[in-house]
Amino acid sequence: MKDHLIIFDTTLRDGEQSPGASMTREEKVRIARQLERMRVDVIEAGFPAASNGDFEAVKAVAAAIKGSTICGLARAIEGDIRRAGEALRGANSARIHTFIATSPIHMEKKLRMSPDQVVEQAVKAVKFARQYTDDVEFSPEDAGRSDITFLCRVLEAVIDAGAGTVNIPDTVGYTMPQQFGELIRTLRERIPNSDKVIFSVHCHNDLGLAVANSLSAVMNGARQVECTVNGLGERAGNASLEEVVMAVRTRQDFFPCDTRIDSVHIVPASKLVSGITGFPVQPNKAIVGANAFAHESGIHQDGVLKHRETYEIMRAEDVGWGANKLLLGKHSGRNAFRSRLAELGIELESEETLNATFMRFKELADKKHDIFDEDLHALVSDDAAALQEHYKLLSLTAHSETGETPHASIVIGEEGRESRAESDGSGPVDATFRAIEKILNSGVELQLYSVNAITSGTDSQGEVTVRLQKSGRIVNGNGADTDIVVASAKAYLSALNKLHSKLERAHPQV
């Protein structure tokens, strides 16, 4: 029987550190439920000590998820670990992931601690974490630049202290695959008690090698890979969950292990994360890109038509690609609507939320003849965003005519008050944004504006992503509507609502 390769997803923690990718508590729970359906082994839900928002998000995920282990990150200090333990109290299966830097430069310049003090602190942290859960993971931050002998000493000590998993991060994405594989093999050979622990890896993609390094580590004995959906993460991102899983699954002739991932949920997870974060997936992205299974060359097309395996090494349907399934229309009832949401893995928290979302569906069905699965995902995302609204779009009129200056008139609700403004602009979207700013005077800088059609057809909903920056903070906002100008206003206000509600948090470099 092959070894089990544990998939540790950190989309909700490390993935959220992408500039602009901040998620609300409800959004984190939605993604966590999709990861649970995918049968992800461990979900790192956040860094509870970073902020009250992070604490509550980890607590909510821990309460909602029963089929995956829920993990909270903590520095190797008692306050962080206590906070993580409290956030995870409601979890069916909980893990605390604690870390401390072990490289000479970090110990000297950042921690101002001697090597002996670092070992002592790491051991204390693991023992303290064991008071909250038997499942403790330890990471030596900046392992790639750490002295190998000292690294072995630290890891041996934390294993003796009760760590069940030791995670080796390539924090700055500098290591080559052969080097990283050799590092894992060396640690397993030199640490006397290495047989009592699972070796994990956490690779960053600064040189485009995160997946390659992770797979090299697996070939050298690592049995947990830390990764994110779509490779999301700060700088160039993390190892991509879908690429790691499908590389191991497709090359079972090569790898001595396999995951328990239900791969048909990969594409839905990719779309969900992309929609919530506002980070589109590049068309040529392996596994989940729109062109991943497209064949332009006539020779390739002919081969695929005759025998799929000529140019396809895996089946599109095995990762969740399927026909754009026609779903519902204006005559569809509430039960059919609820049933289709359940099939898509969308769970609404209450009957009240279901009723409100169904009414929005009926409004959309009046504008759009055919409703597809993608429309429902966008609809639910819009409704989830509405729950966090401080600023609410009440009405919008935009006018654009050839040879005339575009004009917009808008009404925004804020804590029960209504504010109105009008503005001209270089286009209807520009006029709308200017009108919003006349009311709110937010002082933000628009960094990104993008539009994507959710489905095909001239009556398709447009999904707009807006990225705003203010005082060094970056947020993304999304909006969907059959009217692009309305979708743009929704996206702009969505981003402003995130700026209004989100607090700054400390982001660890693990």
Curated annotation (Swiss-Prot):
Q: Where is this region: Regulatory domain?
A: 392-510
Concerning CDD domains, the annotation shows: DRE_TIM_IPMS (cd07940)
Q: What is its subcellular localisation?
A: Cytoplasm
Where it mainly occurs, coarsely classed, is: cytoplasm
Q: What keywords are assigned to this protein?
A: Amino-acid biosynthesis, Branched-chain amino acid biosynthesis, Cytoplasm, Leucine biosynthesis, Manganese, Metal-binding, Transferase
Identify the metabolic or biological route this protein is part of: Amino-acid biosynthesis; L-leucine biosynthesis; L-leucine from 3-methyl-2-oxobutanoate: step 1/4
- What's one GO BP annotation on this UniProt entry? L-leucine biosynthetic process
Pfam families named in the record: HCS_D2, HMGL-like, LeuA_dimer
Q: Its biological function?
A: Catalyzes the condensation of the acetyl group of acetyl-CoA with 3-methyl-2-oxobutanoate (2-ketoisovalerate) to form 3-carboxy-3-hydroxy-4-methylpentanoate (2-isopropylmalate).
User: What is the official name of this protein in its record?
Assistant: 2-isopropylmalate synthase
Gene label:
leuA
